[in-house]
């Protein structure tokens, strides 16, 4: 074997590896005073009572730094206690506390080996080494009333009270719980302390009664990692893995927290901000995250939903913090960075929030808050939120308003405590009572199942009765379209007499007819004299120069009509006057038999033309609407067209007319696509969406759910979901359930289903009854034993799914995404390494 090279370097220590970790190349942030790299991972810091020295402890680290009188300059290392002796060189420290009073020259540390060490800073030596804990000591604390009393919290679940002058511990407190994570003396009660445990329990003890705690608090749903008293001892803050900070009243024995602050990630440290002369910081505290977030959030308990300030100056997880003063915060991270920041100059999260917001009230009114629209008031606000740039669109708008007069101005620096708040206004947008009544009436009476033609007919009747003009036009046009497209083999003379929706022939329910009788009577006083016009009266040759000549001319047959229309230009009567119905007023004239034909014709044409491709088609369709068809008589202009839309042939005829209105068009008649029902329905739903009529669009979508609607599925699902939300908001839960069942949307049914379990079928053959029962037992055991998703490896929560046979469990969203996003041609295999179970082709499940 070749000889070992003697020049090979020795294996580096953890401290050396930590010192070479990758750090950001960026400089200090604007609110950061200084940064010190101690070349090792930092676990804890502690400052002496005179605030002239600070102890820094961590993995193979215990240094003493001298604090510079000028707070803007970094501290300087004056002693490295671990390097003074070979016996203590590789000691690691989980926590450090500086002694007070007669022990002001002593530093107390605890180690992962279960030791309590006492160091003399002046001698730079280890004085005492206590070892009574069987497992690691996580935290320690020193009494401010008895400087020789030290408490230690250990992984073995014990809390021990030490007098460092004695050779062993004085009292042992058994909490009958899991590991003890933190312990802290009360700053106001000399004999009380609080201990935090892995079980989420906080226990308050009196050192005079060591057998049982005098108060137990079910504080968190997971491990409690830190507890901290406010400077005056009134409040107690706790944080843990459940991503919450809880504030407790330490002066009472109440077992309910006063305030709960929710964070986006698990928390490992919380520190109360000291109060200044105006007691500004008495209600504020800082917190840091255990994983996932390197920022420090400063919270004000009077506003627990958004941080007061956010400090982002570390590239690694923040391990500990300490308030050097009311304005200065010291923080340390796992990569060995010790930093000082000025909190008031840090990033203000409130400036990121939009100044306008809205929400539904309990009375179904829309409540909104926004800035008053006043240029004079907005331009008078000359402020920024922090030294961070590009914070919000609001700030950009303010600067733009200030510079609109042509002058240039720089942003004004942030002035702590003196900024001007932007005034806001609150408003309530309530429904009109008639709109709510109309919506509820239609929602309860609309028919979205059964025979399609009857449903459209009845829905048009209901819409007409309550004065819903647009909804009536929609349903009547659909009913007319169904009659046209389903009777294409009949002649025009038969289709002209298709009954339209009226109060006399649309409903079989006599009771509803009697209740709405006053709304269904059609006035005959304003019936025009041209009701009995024939089809021939609507078209005539263009050579007609006078009204009298036009009225006398006619087309004798359908062939002549087709020829006249295809070879000559005509004039189309464009009905665009809105139909307005007053509350309680029956429809007159505009809702007559003739106007109904015009409504149908309009939607048939729009649906036909909107689904043709090609620029020339669109241009011809537009020219058709302007004036490109055969000229009509004055009599026909007064009447509302068209009987030609009453048949399949008339629909194709109008379609040909729209495409051949341009004299330059040479599209063969035989190549023209026919009008189909999906085109009409798609056009109508699009029109309803553009008008914001959610109810009509959703009901049309449900009635014609068997059709292939040419709209994105996600848009239709969003439409149906919006209507379901409206129904539930008004308490119509049965109607919402019916809509979900009749919508034909798998996504909507899945979202609102009571059971969302997704079970993957297997390629293996079906197991027998005994095998299935055994597999079911195994799966039940697997559910209770596994605690992580097989795909994302995060704790199992919410809806869980598993493939039968193998029983590997994961989150429904994870496995669904993995299964359906797989683009390989081969059968998907269970994501668990080594499982090898093949699933059925997903195309068979879609």
From Swiss-Prot:
GO biological process annotation, one example: positive regulation of macroautophagy
InterPro entries, per the entry? WD40/YVTN_repeat-like_dom_sf (IPR015943), WD40_repeat_dom_sf (IPR036322), WD40_rpt (IPR001680), WDR24 (IPR037590), WDR59_RTC1-like_RING_Znf (IPR049566)
Q: Where is the composition biased (Low complexity)?
A: 544-555
Region (Disordered) spans which residues? 541-560
Keywords for this entry?
A: Repeat, WD repeat
* Classification via CDD domains: mRING-H2-C3H3C2_Mio-like
Say which domain of life the source belongs to.
Eukaryota
WD repeats span which residues?
A: 88-129, 132-172, 175-215, 219-258, 262-309, 313-348, 624-663
What are its GO cellular component terms? Answer: cytosol; GATOR2 complex; vacuolar membrane
Cited Gene3D superfamilies: YVTN repeat-like/Quinoprotein amine dehydrogenase (2.130.10.10)
**Which region is the signal sequence?**
none
PANTHER family hit by this protein: GATOR COMPLEX PROTEIN WDR24 (PTHR46200:SF1)
What's the protein called, per UniProt? Uncharacterized WD repeat-containing protein C4F8.11
Report the source organism: Schizosaccharomyces pombe (strain 972 / ATCC 24843)
């Amino acid at each position: 074997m070749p000889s070992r090279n003697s020049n090979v370097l020795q294996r580096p220590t953890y401290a050396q590896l930590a010192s070479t970790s990758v750090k950001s190349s960026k400089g200090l942030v604007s609110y950061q005073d200084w940064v010190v790299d101690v070349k090792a991972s930092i676990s804890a810091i502690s400052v002496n009572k005179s605030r002239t020295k600070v102890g820094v402890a961590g993995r193979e680290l215990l240094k003493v730094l001298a604090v510079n009188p000028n707070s803007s300059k970094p501290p300087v290392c004056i002693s490295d206690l671990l390097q003074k002796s070979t016996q203590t060189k590789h000691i690691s420290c989980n926590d450090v506390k500086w002694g007070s009073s007669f022990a002001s020259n002593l530093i107390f540390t605890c180690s992962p080996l279960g030791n309590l060490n006492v160091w003399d800073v002046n001698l730079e030596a280890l004085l005492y080494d206590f070892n009574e804990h069987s497992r690691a000591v996580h935290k320690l604390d020193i009494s401010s009333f008895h400087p020789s009393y030290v408490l230690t919290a250990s992984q073995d679940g014990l809390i021990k009270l030490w007098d460092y002058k004695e050779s062993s511990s004085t009292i042992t407190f058994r909490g009958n719980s899991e590991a003890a994570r933190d312990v802290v003396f009360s700053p106001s009660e000399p004999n009380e302390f609080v201990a935090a445990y892995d079980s989420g329990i906080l226990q308050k003890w009196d050192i005079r009664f060591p057998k049982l705690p005098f108060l137990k608090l079910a504080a968190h749903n997971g491990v409690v990692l830190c507890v901290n008293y406010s400077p005056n001892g009134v409040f107690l803050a706790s944080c843990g893995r459940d991503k919450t900070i809880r504030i407790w009243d330490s002066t009472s024995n109440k077992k309910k927290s006063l305030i709960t602050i929710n964070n986006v990630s698990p928390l490992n440290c919380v520190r109360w901000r000291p109060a200044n002369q105006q007691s500004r910081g008495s209600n504020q505290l800082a917190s840091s995250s255990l994983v996932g977030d390197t920022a420090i959030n400063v919270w004000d308990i009077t506003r627990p939903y958004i941080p007061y300030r956010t400090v982002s100056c570390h590239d690694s997880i923040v391990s500990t913090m300490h308030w050097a003063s009311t304005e200065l915060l010291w923080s340390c991270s796992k990569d060995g960075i010790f930093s000082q920041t000025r909190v008031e100059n840090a990033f203000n999260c409130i400036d990121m929030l939009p100044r306008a917001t809205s929400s539904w009230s309990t009375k179904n009114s829309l409540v909104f808050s926004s800035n008053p629209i006043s240029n004079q008031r907005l331009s008078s606000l000359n402020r920024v939120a922090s030294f961070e740039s590009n914070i919000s669109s609001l700030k950009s708008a303010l600067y733009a308003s200030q510079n609109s007069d042509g002058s240039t101005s720089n942003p004004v620096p942030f002035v702590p405590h003196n900024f001007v708040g932007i005034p806001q206004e609150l408003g309530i947008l309530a429904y009109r009572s008639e709109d709510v009544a109309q919506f509820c009436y239609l929602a309860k009476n609309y028919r979205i199942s059964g025979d399609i033609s009857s449903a459209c007919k009845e829905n048009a009747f209901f819409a007409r009765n309550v004065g819903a003009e647009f909804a009536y036009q929609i349903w009547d046009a659909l009913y007319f379209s169904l009659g046209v497209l389903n009777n294409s083999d009949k002649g025009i003379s038969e289709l002209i007499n298709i009954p339209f929706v009226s109060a006399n022939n649309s409903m079989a329910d006599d009771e509803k007819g009697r209740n709405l009788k006053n709304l269904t009577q059609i006035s005959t006083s304003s019936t025009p004299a041209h009701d009995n016009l024939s089809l021939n009266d609507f078209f005539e040759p263009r050579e007609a120069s006078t009204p009298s000549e036009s009225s006398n001319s006619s087309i004798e047959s359908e062939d002549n009509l087709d020829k006249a229309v295809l070879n000559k230009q005509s004039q189309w009567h464009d009905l665009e006057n809105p139909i307005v119905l007053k509350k309680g007023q029956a429809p007159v004239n505009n809702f007559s038999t003739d106007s109904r034909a015009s409504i149908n014709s309009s939607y048939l044409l729009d649906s036909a033309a909107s689904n043709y491709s090609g620029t020339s088609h669109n241009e011809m369709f537009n020219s058709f609407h302007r004036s490109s068809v055969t000229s009509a008589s004055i009599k026909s202009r007064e009447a509302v067209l068209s009987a030609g839309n009453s048949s399949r042939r008339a629909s194709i005829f109008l379609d040909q007319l729209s495409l051949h209105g341009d004299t330059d068009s040479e599209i063969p008649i035989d190549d023209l696509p026919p009008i189909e029902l999906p085109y009409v329905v798609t056009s109508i739903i699009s029109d309803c969406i553009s008008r914001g009529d959610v109810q009509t669009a959703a009901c049309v979508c449900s009635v014609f759910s068997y059709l292939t609607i040419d709209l994105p599925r996600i848009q239709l699902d969003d439409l149906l979901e919006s209507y379901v939300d409206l129904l539930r908001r008004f308490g119509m839960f049965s109607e919402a359930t019916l809509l979900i069942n009749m919508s034909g949307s798998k996504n909507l049914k899945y979202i609102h289903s009571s059971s969302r379990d997704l079970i993957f079928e297997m390629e293996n053959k079906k197991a027998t009854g005994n095998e299935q029962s055994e597999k079911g037992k195994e799966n039940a055991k697997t559910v209770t034993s596994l605690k992580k998703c097989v795909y994302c490896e995060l704790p199992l929560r919410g809806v869980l799914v598993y493939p039968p046979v193998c029983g590997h469990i994961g989150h429904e969203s994870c496995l669904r995404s993995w299964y359906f996003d797989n683009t390989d041609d081969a059968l998907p295999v269970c994501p668990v390494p080594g499982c090898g179970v093949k699933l059925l082709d997903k195309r068979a499940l879609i």
